[in-house]
Amino acid sequence: MRILVVDNYDSFVYNLVQYLGQLGVDCEVRRNDEVDLAEVGRIDPAGVLLSPGPGTPQRAGICMPLVREYGDRWPILGVCLGHQAIGAAYGATVNRAPELLHGKTSQVHHRGDGVLAGLPDPFTATRYHSLAVVESTLPEEIEVTGRTESGVVMAMRHRSLPIEGVQFHPESVLTQGGHLLLANWLATCGYPQALDRAPALVEEVEAHRLAAFAA
């Protein structure tokens, strides 16, 4: 199975690729301004991951057009900037976040929907962002599936299409259940075997996470 990872010029992208590889899939990584919609169609991946990155969704190259063009063709997962690009593609406002957190953790409250299935409620997530999707501007077809205690949107999904976004970084060692989140998404891409690999990987990362908090 091959996943297309759209690289928004971010240093974290290969951590995501590593997690996906550990779950058993191959990744093709393309910069957001070095691939067009026609080429994405020719690649015909099992799913598309829109990576974190600097700047705004409007400056994230192919991301917003890709969501509009192919949102009904393959599962799409947006992470951080990729998450914001999904919101913006559906007309939502992305504005300065009420709290600016870079490398800090927050508790995410959720109901276990979509990629968050099986994660603790709440769970600890690592945040690197100064912008956030404004919930009140989201259209009816996009539902919020995770929030911080203060109400900042941390996860959302389309109600009928396989499109999801998370504002936090699942690939961070300080985030709980990152492998499980990605495995849930890979299952929607047609690779449920990832769910068999996830528990051992989650356990390994959790040991590192607890050690980091204890230090």
Where do the protein language model's features map onto the residues?
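Flexible gly/pro-rich beta->alpha loop and the following alpha-helix that scaffold active-site loops
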Residues: R2-V6, D10-G78, Y90, G190
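Short beta-strand segments
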Residues: V5, T126-R127, Q167
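Generic structural signal for residues in well-ordered beta-strands
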Residues: C27-V29, V94, V144
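Cysteine-nucleophile active-site neighborhood
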Residues: P45-G118, P122, L182-A183
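Histidine-centered divalent metal-coordination motifs
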Residues: C80, H129, H169
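Catalytic beta-strand/loop cores that center a nucleophilic Ser/Cys/Thr
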Residues: G112-L161
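Phosphate-binding/catalytic loops
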Residues: S160, G165-Q176
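Acyltransferase
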Residues: V173-A215
